[in-house]
A protein has these predicted regions:
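Solvent-exposed loop/turn segments at secondary-structure junctions
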Residues: 19-24, 37, 134, 153-154
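Fold-level signature of zinc-dependent metallopeptidase catalytic domains
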Residues: 3-33
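Metalloprotease/metallohydrolase-associated module, dominated by Zn2+-dependent proteases
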Residues: 99-115, 134-214
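Hydrophobic beta-strand segments of well-ordered beta-sheets in folded domains
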Residues: 9-18, 81-84, 105-108, 144-145
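Histidine (H) residue identity feature
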Residues: 15-17, 23, 45, 68, ...
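Metzincin-family zinc-dependent endopeptidase catalytic domain
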Residues: 27-139
């Protein structure tokens, strides 16, 4: 989730603030998550049209580690920039997840957050409105976009093991090969957002405070 702002220089900024908590959260990991999201989502340098004006889309991501955050603070949040993610070594289903398409909360499994994993950038995409693509066989179509999930069929160089046949163990997309493409920015449909005084909101409040999984 984030706050969208258009400035006088024809730049559209999406501001999001990542707040982490949980037994596996650390200041260093929090900054790594922030950097991954900001770096990857700014890579396309995408130009889009808003009200017949070409604007460049930029993401400004800040982050904060709040070890002792309370459930009340999360539940009562009314700042559209704030996104809350619990980080733990154990997660039910063995996956990281967010609380729906268009949301501002979720649960990250520590193992999924290694440097270059693209997990944080992928889950952030869900918070601002993007779902997994329907066609999960993109062989012959090049680099997978950021919203493709694990299990997607891709060209060999994007697999866990390029020597494996597609669809077998090792023969599916390695998440580290995902990239944020211009198409991902276009899919945000920013031109349909209603602005007021050059500001708008992308995503929705879910404000879920997650407990550790047992």
């Amino acid at each position: 989730m984030g706050e969208v702002e258009i400035d006088s220089q024809r730049q559209l900024y999406i501001h999001s603030h990542i707040i982490t908590y949980g037994h596996a959260a650390t200041p260093q990991l929090t900054d790594q998550i922030r950097d991954e999201i900001e770096t990857m989502w700014n890579e396309p340098h995408a130009l889009i049209n808003i009200q017949s004006t070409a604007v460049i889309v930029r993401f400004k991501i800040t982050a904060e580690f709040k070890q002792h955050i309370s459930d009340i603070e999360v539940y009562q949040n009314d700042d559209p920039r704030n996104n809350y993610f619990r980080i733990e070594e154990f997660a039910l289903g063995n996956i990281s997840f967010v609380d729906g398409i268009n949301c501002n909360s979720g649960f990250f499994k520590l193992e999924n957050l290694y440097k270059g994993s693209t997990t944080a950038a992928h889950e952030y995409g869900h918070t601002i409105g993007l779902d997994h693509p329907k066609d999960l066989d993109i062989r012959g179509k090049g680099t997978p976009g950021i919203m493709y999930p694990r299990g997607t069929l891709v060209d060999p160089q994007f697999q866990y093991d390029p020597s494996k046949p597609a669809g077998t163990k090792g023969g599916t997309m390695h998440p580290m090969h995902r990239k944020v493409l211009r198409a991902d920015i276009v899919n945000l449909k920013l031109h349909k957002i209603r602005f007021r005084n050059n500001k708008a909101i992308i995503g929705e409040f879910t404000n879920v405070y997650h407990l550790p999984h047992m």
